């Protein structure tokens, strides 16, 4: 193979000019046309018997284009291997104006290469190791939440209070005119739950079933309904029903409802503590991992290939559309989401992917089989039949990609915590459970 010069363009972009001998192009084109001749069905000729000259007239140009495309791909691959180029994404091929060699056809390949990743001094980085504990108070708090989730509402003949579920008819008018979405019959909501605007809810408090009243409501400027944002409406409200909440007792029936077959309340509390502890551990680990990843981003100055960022942004856009579809928004599949809204997140993900790959390779942080099994077992623990979940993962090794990635990240976190300046941060139960994770 002739030597090829790799031209350095901007940032990670490179360019090579590929020379394709016309003799090779013509020979491959002839071969392709003969293959076409054997299967061509042309009026006036038996299948496969049309003259080659006619086949060349009909299909010659497209056959030559196909051959050139195939040879360009093959030649670029050969050059990348010979020059030890770490190509990121797919190359872009362009014609070369100066076709000064009659013996060959020239094509320029423009592409990006992976950056050289150099991990900085991790001992200079600060990371937060987040901790939290789960005791009796946290179990009590969780049990109370579980009770509220099983609230029953019973009809009462009294004035409506916060916490009651009310059923109302209402009609709203702005400047004396009804507006879209401003009226409903037998609408149910819980007072104080924030389902309605504060002035609306305050107007219902103190009413009794059968009563009607007018309530003035000022829509905030930032209200999601643009047609009414910043405007004042008068709602005529009729209260049809008031029901007060009744929480279940923490007894054997309650324990059975939570899956404790014999209704043992102590066992139920232990199960609650185990589940809550697992979730708290997951969340504090996520926050610690986020701190570690931020430290790695700071420790490495890195230019990332635009091609990889664009690919990741497109993947994130498709993921968002699929999530919308899964939520019942069937038309979301056709949404044209601008990739720019995903670029920052995509660039961070690509950067971390490159950094982690380097860190894992340099420091032998690949997970062991036992570590992967532990991650799978942790996944399975929250299901009714853990072994069934474990068997599902191991029935198809491609399903182990997610557990393997988590095991890798865990090893990276432990490695960085052993190198960086670690600041321990204890969070309360509410702080942990209120965090997005």
From Swiss-Prot:
Output the Gene Ontology terms for molecular function. Answer: peptidyl-prolyl cis-trans isomerase activity; protein folding chaperone; ribosome binding
Pfam families, alphabetized: FKBP_C, Trigger_C, Trigger_N
Superkingdom of source: Bacteria
> Which reaction equation describes what this protein catalyses?
[protein]-peptidylproline (omega=180) = [protein]-peptidylproline (omega=0)
Keyword Chaperone assigned to the entry: answer is yes
Subcellular location, principal: cytoplasm
GO cellular component term of the entry, any: cytoplasm
**Protein role:** Involved in protein export. Acts as a chaperone by maintaining the newly synthesized protein in an open conformation. Functions as a peptidyl-prolyl cis-trans isomerase.
- What is this protein's name? Trigger factor
What is the source species?
Neisseria gonorrhoeae (strain NCCP11945)
